[in-house]
Amino acid sequence: MQLLNTLYVTTPESYIHLDNDTLRVEVEKTTRLRVPLHHLGAVVCFGYVSVSLPLMHRLADDGISLVLLDSHGRFKARLEGAVSGNVLLRQAQHGLGRDPAFALAVARNCVAGKVRNCRQVLLRGSREAKVPEEAELLSRGAADLAATLRALPTAADLDTLRGFEGEAARQYFAALTTLLRASARASFRMDGRNRRPPRDRINALLSFVYTLLMNDCRSAVEAAGLDPQIGFLHAVRPGRAALALDLMEEFRAFADRLVLSLINRGQVGANDFVEREGGAVLLEGDARKTVLVAYQERKQENLSHPLLSEPVPFGLLPHVQARLLARTLRGDTAEYLPYLVR
């Protein structure tokens, strides 16, 4: 399997255009980068980046997605080619999306995957903690998440299930900053998860990485021939890629671990953020490039998958899971099984 690479264009006023079978990046009429199109799975542009019309056509023809984000990483638009995939699969997805029992079963497993993987983050932290009080706090957090896992089968509807998920998230984020090195906690303290806009540095970093992960999950869903708008856990709303968000849940723990690593290694520091009027905190400058490089490197790390005989790069795991979900929608498998961290 080949890992589909994503090109991130972050330099303001860049111009990207088609040069035969190559994408060329220019800044002030100077060529900065050439990338053969067959090496690319997606192109993501931050802020004021110009894209030539011939390149747009070629990306659409070659099935390479073009994603436009604002300068702070918020999603703006996405260009895709013709819709691919089996229409019968999408019909099945739409029909099963209206089946309360089926939707609840898929949503429950998405939440179970998320909670279980987040619990593994806390358990690992507890084992590695040097301070007994911190190890105990992380162990209690892991125990709370284990209680949520035991309660999930009792959820009789999506609202109850979402309530369990919300409480688990609250317990998880309450313990998460304990995994930061002590010298970074004052700068990266958080009072739970907040967004739109993020109100502290760690939430700003989490939001940035979650945006990258969501784009990859949406690409995986679309590559499998599924409709990204029709989800099971996340309610259907205009403009929301509900199914991509469903798929993303089981991978959030990977994003969280990357964020913790960036802070603990000093790759991202307190001065890499700016506070805007109204209290919004945003990742700025070269730190975004640091995060993008680290994210791309993490995507190339090989992980085992219980259903495959060979290691899989993390960047391909959303594609594997999207295809497993498609098999469930076709009726080839009894239930959707999320990817679980070992």
Where are these regions (language model features)?
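Active-site helix-to-loop segments that bind/position phosphate- or nucleotide-bearing substrates
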Residues: M1-H17, E28, R34, L88-R342
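N-terminal ordered "arm"
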Residues: H17-V49
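A surface-exposed, charged beta-strand/loop segment in the N-terminal or early-internal portion
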Residues: H39, G47-Q120
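Long, contiguous hydrophobic alpha-helical segments, chiefly transmembrane helices and signal peptides
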Residues: V43-C45, L59, F75, L205, ...
